Amino acid sequence: MVRGLFPGRFQPPHWGHIYAVKEILKEVDEVIIAMGSAQFNYLLKDPFTAGERIWMLREGLREGGVDLSRVVIIPIPNVENNLEWLGRVKSYTPPFDVIYTGNPFVALLFREAGYEVRQQPMFQRERYSSTRVRELLLRGDPSWEELVPKSVAEIIKKLRGAERIKTAASGEAEPHKW
């Protein structure tokens, strides 16, 4: 069995993520989604909890026609030391053969650790970006819904995600500044 690792924050998951997983599954038997920054939530850059992101991603993948029996989602907390983070990823996940990333620094870390690194499949990256989704939610622009699966949009609305992001933007949601 060939396993691929696909790290990301998925804040929130969008159609580009769904596309990437579908493309990765054309090359591997199973994809491990390493959901980074698992300990962060209710922040402008990280508004959703790890559990909420897992929920959104599973529903979005299901809506996108992905066989969830071939997908493992594992939350990975961040650490400040990059080599410690690499070790944490390796200890939290089942063994994997190849990593898919669009981040040159992540690619460097894994390549130096002896892993095969492949370019993450991209789908209209300038359009499909979690940063863009959060910015549109912050502005109250309803076009954010076009960028995510309908199931993800419904979850974001249920969680009052726009309100959460607007509150986080006020700066009151940063505990390290208290």
Curated annotation (Swiss-Prot):
GO cellular component, one term: cytoplasm
Keywords: ATP-binding, Cytoplasm, NAD, Nucleotide-binding, Nucleotidyltransferase, Pyridine nucleotide biosynthesis, Transferase
Molecular function terms from GO: ATP binding; nicotinamide-nucleotide adenylyltransferase activity
Pfam families, per database record: CTP_transf_like (PF01467)
Pathway the protein acts in: Cofactor biosynthesis; NAD(+) biosynthesis; NAD(+) from nicotinamide D-ribonucleotide: step 1/1
One GO BP: NAD biosynthetic process
Gene3D superfamilies documented for this protein: HUPs (3.40.50.620)
CDD domains reported for this sequence: NMNAT_Archaea
UniProt xrefs under InterPro entries: Cyt_trans-like (IPR004821), NMN_Atrans_arc (IPR006418), Rossmann-like_a/b/a_fold (IPR014729)
EC number, as in UniProt: 2.7.7.1
Subcellular localization, as worded in the UniProt entry: Cytoplasm
Primary location class: cytoplasm
Catalytic activity: beta-nicotinamide D-ribonucleotide + ATP + H(+) = diphosphate + NAD(+)
Family label: Belongs to the archaeal NMN adenylyltransferase family.
The protein's name in its UniProt record: Nicotinamide-nucleotide adenylyltransferase
UniProt source species: Pyrobaculum arsenaticum (strain DSM 13514 / JCM 11321 / PZ6)
